[in-house]
């Protein structure tokens, strides 16, 4: 039997960021997961050496960089490769430059069941959406009314957990692509219920650790 969760990280950064990433997932309170790190292009020697020290739940691989789609969908190829080789019932997508609370996976999986996906909060402006794609109309997510979620336009990469079977049927695309388009297609096609859980679990760019943010919840903002 495979793991409950497959965590997929499209990686392109160096040892410092990846060391933090490995440590954050080593400390997760939820243990039934695999962590697939897909390096975009040939990894440096120091990254290869670091990955040799990773825990047995970590699978490291690299793919040929997709230069033809770098401008419009730089993360599509590594994410889809991760989906293809994953074994988990659920998928979580994590960036390699963020920090993750030890309760991150436990919080995401806590309310997942048949037709439901979980959403958690991030620590900065990347956890907001743009109404109709317009950056002048900003609404913070994912603290948004549960019944309004399918109409939102932006969700940050590590905010959500989805069924693997959904991502296989509706993978990332080679077109102007972002997390909000991927998750919006999932919502439109499979019409899952959304459970917003656990408050803030993701520290974007390490702002909390740098003392620039606190682990607090944003006040709710809703789309008009």
In which residue ranges do the predicted regions lie?
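Short aromatic/hydrophobic "clamp" motif used to bind/position activated sugar donors
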Residues: 91
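Short, well-formed alpha-helical segments that are part of the catalytic scaffolds
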Residues: 14-27
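Conserved donor NDP-sugar-binding/catalytic core segment of glycosyltransferases
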Residues: 105-136
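The conserved acidic donor/metal-binding loop of glycosyltransferases
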Residues: 95-99
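Glycine-rich, basic loop-to-helix element that forms the pyrophosphate-binding segment
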Residues: 66-86
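Conserved nucleotide-sugar donor-binding catalytic segment
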Residues: 145-224
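Acidic donor-binding segment of Leloir-type glycosyltransferases
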Residues: 24-68
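Cell-envelope/extracellular polymer assembly enzymes that use nucleotide-activated donors
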Residues: 3-6, 24, 34, 181
């Amino acid at each position: 039997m495979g793991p409950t969760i497959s965590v997929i990280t499209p990686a392109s950064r160096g040892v410092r960021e990846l060391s933090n990433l490995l440590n954050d997932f080593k400390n997760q309170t939820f243990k039934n997961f695999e962590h697939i790190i897909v390096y975009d292009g040939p990894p440096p020697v120091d990254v290869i050496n670091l990955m040799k020290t990773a825990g047995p739940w970590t699978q490291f691989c690299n793919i040929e960089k997709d230069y033809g789609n770098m401008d419009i969908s730089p993360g599509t190829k590594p994410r889809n490769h991760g989906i293809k080789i994953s074994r988990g019932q659920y998928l979580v997508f994590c960036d390699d430059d963020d920090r993750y609370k030890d309760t991150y996976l436990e919080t995401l999986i806590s309310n997942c069941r048949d037709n439901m996906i979980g959403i958690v909060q991030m620590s900065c402006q990347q956890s907001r959406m743009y109404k109709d794609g317009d950056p002048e109309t900003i609404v913070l997510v994912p603290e948004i009314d549960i019944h309004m979620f399918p109409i939102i336009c932006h969700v940050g990469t590590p905010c959500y957990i989805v069924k693997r079977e959904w991502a296989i049927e509706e993978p990332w695309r080679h077109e102007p692509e972002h997390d909000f388009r991927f998750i919006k297609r999932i919502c439109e096609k499979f019409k899952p219920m959304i459970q917003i859980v656990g408050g803030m679990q993701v520290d974007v760019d390490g702002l909390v650790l740098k003392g620039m943010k606190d682990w607090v919840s944003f006040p709710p903002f809703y789309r008009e």
